[in-house]
């Protein structure tokens, strides 16, 4: 399995749209084949930080997810709204 922790740092101005966009990505991604988990967390200590935790069954499922229309549309939008940092783990 593969685990991705994606940290999103945004601004107060962009926060509402960032959360809405991330929620849209989560809802669509949960339907992708091989998605074990896909969750959005809002930091309790830093209002400018969100985290998406993704778990994929394997590299093939993750690669397929990265070609979906929701990924290719919403991830670039999240990049416009904030700064993304990705940590990838193999379970």
Language model segments and positions:
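Glycine-rich beta-strand-turn "strand-cap" elements at beta-sheet edges
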Residues: 2, 40-48, 73-91
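Residue-level signal for well-ordered alpha-helical positions
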Residues: 21, 41, 65-68, 77
